[in-house]
Amino acid sequence: MARLSAFNFQKWIDEHKHLLKPPVGNQQVWEDADLMVTVVGGPNKRTDYHDDPVEEFFYQLKGDMVLKLYEGGEFYDVPIREGDIFLLPPHVRHSPQRPQEGSIGLVIEPKRPEGAHDAIEWFCFGCGSLVHRAELLLESIVRDLPPVYQAFYADEQARTCPNCGEIHPGKEPPEGWVKL
């Protein structure tokens, strides 16, 4: 068995910087640990909200981000500035927005309990109603989420609001939706 040792995290970030921008945007530090330790780079804007069955810890290493939340029937923004930390409780719908080029955040969350499902939700930009919810067993953020997004973006029926009929734009949020 190999001996445990530390490594320089900034060097790791520098070596993986090419993966911390679109279209990938994030990279897990370890694939085989009980914690999912993910480094996320900007720019990144998304239109979905994540329903996570476990807590998420956010540490904004470089630049600023906004965590859009939907809680108790209300949408609101939580700015997370460079150097800030934030602990998100389980099942609070959230949409991380990192519009700044070169921004870097660290997100730490436990692996899911056996059988626990994550969900990705999209809400109507017109009336605020839930447009679509996709549930999944999440093991790797990098590997498991992209197919869920691609399926939603490709399906106009899934993107049609059942309340007002507006078509969700898919990948691109409306102009001005993200404000730092």
Swiss-Prot record:
So where does O2 get bound?
A: 46
Q: Does the keyword Nucleotidyltransferase apply?
A: no
Give the highest taxon in the source lineage.
Bacteria
Q: In which pathway is this protein known to take part?
A: Cofactor biosynthesis; NAD(+) biosynthesis; quinolinate from L-kynurenine: step 3/3
Q: What is its EC number?
A: 1.13.11.6
Report the Pfam families cross-referenced here. Answer: 3-HAO (PF06052)
Q: Name one GO biological process term.
A: quinolinate biosynthetic process
Instruction: Recite the UniProt cofactor note for this protein.
Output: Binds 2 Fe(2+) ions per subunit.
Per UniProt, the enzyme's principal EC class comes to oxidoreductase
Residues recorded as binding substrate, renumbered to this chain, are 56, 98, 109
Q: Which reaction does it catalyse?
A: 3-hydroxyanthranilate + O2 = (2Z,4Z)-2-amino-3-carboxymuconate 6-semialdehyde
Q: Which GO terms describe its molecular function?
A: 3-hydroxyanthranilate 3,4-dioxygenase activity; ferrous iron binding
Which key words tag this protein in UniProt? Dioxygenase, Iron, Metal-binding, Oxidoreductase, Pyridine nucleotide biosynthesis
Matching InterPro entries:
3hydroanth_dOase (IPR010329), RmlC-like_jellyroll (IPR014710), RmlC_Cupin_sf (IPR011051)
Positions of Fe cation 1 binding? 50, 56, 94
Which cofactors must be present for this protein to function?
Fe(2+)
Signal peptide: which range, if any?
Answer: none
Key word Iron present: yes
| HAMAP family recorded | 3_HAO
Q: What assembly does the database describe for this protein?
A: Homodimer.
Query: What family is reported?
Result: Belongs to the 3-HAO family.
What function does this protein fulfil? Catalyzes the oxidative ring opening of 3-hydroxyanthranilate to 2-amino-3-carboxymuconate semialdehyde, which spontaneously cyclizes to quinolinate.
Q: What is this protein called?
A: 3-hydroxyanthranilate 3,4-dioxygenase
Encoding gene, per UniProt annotation: nbaC
